[in-house]
Amino acid sequence: MKAAYNYRATKTACSDRQVLILGTSWADPQPGTMEEIRISIVNDKATRNKRNIEEETDLSPPPKKLRSAVFLCSTPSSAPHCSQNVEVFDEFDDSLLEASSDESDSPLHMTLVQIEELLEDDCDYAAEPPRWDEESDSVGFLQELAVPNGSQSDLVELRNLNSPLAGEQSDSSQTLTEETVCSQDTSNYAAMAPSPCWSNISTAGQNEEAGGNVSTTTSPVLHKHEMDRGSRDSDICSTLSSSHLPGDLKVVDEISETSDIPFDGDIDELLTLSPGDTTSSEEDKITSESTPILSKLESVPVVHSHSEAFCKSSSSLQLPETSLASSTEPSPSLQLSASSVTAMNGQNNSNKVPPPTSDTAPGPQLGTDTNSQKSKGQKVEPKKNKPIEQIGLKQGGKSFAAPVDHPVKENLGQTSKEQVAASIGCKKKVNPSPLQEKKHGAVPTKPRAACRPQISNSELEKNRNIYRDRVMMHLEVHSISEEPNYELAYLLNETSRENPTWQHPSDYTKRNYYVRRQPAPCSLNDWVMRNGGHSIQRFHGLPCTFKRSPMPGVLPTGPT
């Protein structure tokens, strides 16, 4: 049998192979008797034809083939070329899609079809826009909770406002009310994006600046709750006014106050909300009367550290004189913010020469305001809350308002003068100490270069003689010539003068060393004869093992 293989190269995969079988016998090797049988085997990989599963069904299921390392999923992939690359995958293996005997092969105990359905449901849920129509029932329930004691007519008004017709009217008039805030989903406030809606007070301020082209519509029910809540918000720091908070926070605050449903919010939201302190009935009455004043005053743009509201024209800040006169009267439950006070002062002084700038707080301005009020004949009630002082800091042409609270004891008998004096007394004027001038001292002279003194011999001899004469005069005056030490010194000096070779004991330049005499050189035999001769056996006690080195002609080789 001989087999010949012919390969045809293709671009996609292996080509068809053709087997040629030659039938021959060994007895007749002639080529004429050979039978040529050609068998062509079709390769499915080359033609890319799938087999029919029904024709290939056997008793045993086909073994599962190993997949490649590339992971394929039913969800859209960022690399679509992975499933279309023919060089990487030879064929699509459908054996994994066949139903096996045990459906619990996956860790989730779910089939691949069920997993794909779950993935599609998740994708549809993520891409689905929020359904506002389905949430209308929950919004209506929240609005009914916001008005627990309201009448049936109020509820009908709220439902009419939430109707599509009311929504079209509100869109045509371009107004934003509290009902539009309620129409949003408030069940999951922590996950909501910041609402574009503003509060009624902020829209009122915007309408004042726009010139009154936009009409403000407010709900009577929510306005009632806004008036009740004004007394509770009076003790909050004045820098955080109700216009600073988004409208969603107001709605959540009202629902949490008027209903028993627990509020589920973040710690940041709880910190920004009002504490809800209890107040007396008298303060509630005064608050309800002063609520319109609050809406007018807070319509003035507030000065923040990151804004420049004073750069606007004075026409946008003009208010009627009656509102200014009523707003200057302090109430026990109403506390103006420092930013609104600065805006009012800027309006009153718009036609006057601006005062010189100073780093200290504007304390005298408060005194002038109270005196002008007394001249008009208006009675000023004592303040029960903490007075607010404003410290103005001007940096680079921008004004920054920072409120500072000074605690003052409550005293109903105090007049406005005493309060102004107490507030001014709290301010401590810091006078900068004068700079200490440096004392100009004497400039130290530069040290001269050190040089070796040079003395002439004549001058040295002259100084020596003067010194010697003074010493001799000292000895003669004290009469110490009789002492033995003086006599010895005198004797040594005289001896050294007479005999220059004599060594003076005070002269340490010469030393008297003893010199040993060197003996006369002699031979060894002479030295032996001088020290006892040969009769003295010096090495007689040495053992026989000791032998000296042989010195021929000088010493014998060994003892005899």
Swiss-Prot record:
Main localization category: nucleus
Top-rank taxon, per record: Eukaryota
Residue segments, region Disordered: 259-292, 313-400
Transmembrane segments: none
Residue spans of biased composition, Basic and acidic residues class: 378-387
A single cellular component GO annotation: nucleus
GO molecular function: calcium-dependent protein binding
Pfam families xrefs: S100PBPR (PF15427)
Swiss-Prot/TrEMBL keywords: Nucleus
Amino-acid biosynthesis found in the keyword field: no
Polar residues bias locations: 313-352
Localization annotation: Nucleus
InterPro entries in the cross-refs: S100PBP (IPR026097)
Protein name from the UniProt record: S100P-binding protein
Source organism (scientific name): Xenopus laevis
Name of the gene encoding the protein in the UniProt record: s100pbp
